[in-house]
From Swiss-Prot:
The gene is rnz. Keywords: Endonuclease, Hydrolase, Metal-binding, Nuclease, tRNA processing, Zinc. This is Ribonuclease Z. The active site is at D67. Zn(2+) 2 binds at D67, H68, D216, H274. It comes from Streptococcus uberis (strain ATCC BAA-854 / 0140J). Gene3D superfamilies: Ribonuclease Z/Hydroxyacylglutathione hydrolase-like.
Amino acid sequence: MELQFLGTGAGQPAKQRNVSSLVLKLLDEINEVWMFDCGEGTQRQILETSIKPRKIQKIFITHLHGDHIFGLPGFLSSRAFQASEEQTDIEIFGPLGIKSFVQNSLAISGTRLPYKIHFHEFTDKDMGKIMETDKFLVYAEKLAHTIFCMGYRVVQKDLEGTLDAEALKKAGVPFGPLFGKIKNGQDIVLDDGRQILAKDYISEPKKGKVITILGDTRKTPASQRLALNADVLVHESTYGKGDDRIARNHGHSTNMQAAQIAKDANVKRLLLNHVSARFLSRDCRQMEKDAASLFENVKIVKDLEEVTI
């Protein structure tokens, strides 16, 4: 499971940072990639990665500001150009209005897609669990931005314990149907009368990962709820230390506010993105250092950077 950041800048493209987009790679888990936001130029950023557009089967939009959605029509169109590969449908989750934006953009440009788009639109009355599969849950809450904006909490369901095949072989259990019974938690009796207890050969269930990905937001209790005990929190850092007032006026957060949320929510790792273009490399190093005074395990991520979860 990995995060890869396609755009980590704020507002408009800059030389070092494109606008907002990131992907959650779940290739080992479910052979899918999930995208979060799709600012302009996202499809160009993908060309610099190993990501296959057809693997992107779910897109989660945080809000409808242009730097988070203007790349969506282009990405959906270029995804259709993979004629030699199997076409897969795509699901788009986001605020009310995302469906009309996408459909109007495609219609006006005369774009016809060889796959279906399934839209899931939400208002502030629809928050809570918004998606569930056999392996994952996704929750959403309203954040505190200048327009309706959502934050997402992706929860991997606990993983089943693994079967210790080598130990079973040593115990004289013949490979075959008996292995399956033990894996399903069923005790068995061998031909020689020995009882094999399933619990002795299956490891404890492994706790699933929790990844919280927030959109643009002021400091708000909703961020802390979404991030509670998360393995990774992706939080915006449009402004730096001492910029609390201007951040609040513009519906954004500072690096210090993000660090405080991470600390209060007991997250394991904080990744800061949505960085203003006015912050150069040396400024970002200082912002990271300042944030680390509140929450040690913090990093300001760069475009195309990958983080293993």
